[in-house]
Amino acid sequence: MGTLTVQTLQAPTSGANANKLLVGSGHTLHAAGHVIQTVSGAPATDVAYSTLTETNVFTLNITPKFNTSKILILVNYGLYLNSSAAYDRGDFIIRRDTTLIRGRDDGGGTGYFRDGSGHFKAYMTSFNHLDSPATTSQITYKMAWKGHTYTAGGSFDENYTNMSLMEIAQ
């Protein structure tokens, strides 16, 4: 292997690929900070919950191309409460395979989410998490809900609940 040192790369200014620098078939461009790949999805139907145990809301797979990549996880939870009870408390959880990377495993405390109104309500909760999985094997990311202390039950609406995963080069 040799090293090619240049000051400027310039694409042709005319033709079918005018002003484009092309990477040959079967090769990849690796530039820190760029998005290598994106996958996204949503549950096919509404997902109901009614207990204090962890409820799987949605899973999505990605296979990183580089073990140095970071995965930016973007999630939206469209939560509807079936509540006429005094409280509904819980936590929004993200797992990488079986490892908890966001949220809480225990059932104590008030949780991330708390509603004490005793009314039926809809909430839209969005957040992101930057993960460093250090692998090129397939990863399964899981969105979940875990009730804490009280749970009156509810559902995650398929039209407002989704997840996107972006592999970011380092």
Locate the predicted segments by residue.
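Glycine-rich, low-complexity segments
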Residues: 3-47, 170
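Terminal beta-strand-rich extracellular "head" domains
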Residues: 41-50, 63-170
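Short, solvent-exposed loop/turn segments enriched in Ser/Thr/Gly
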Residues: 54-56
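Extended, low-complexity regulatory regions
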Residues: 58-62
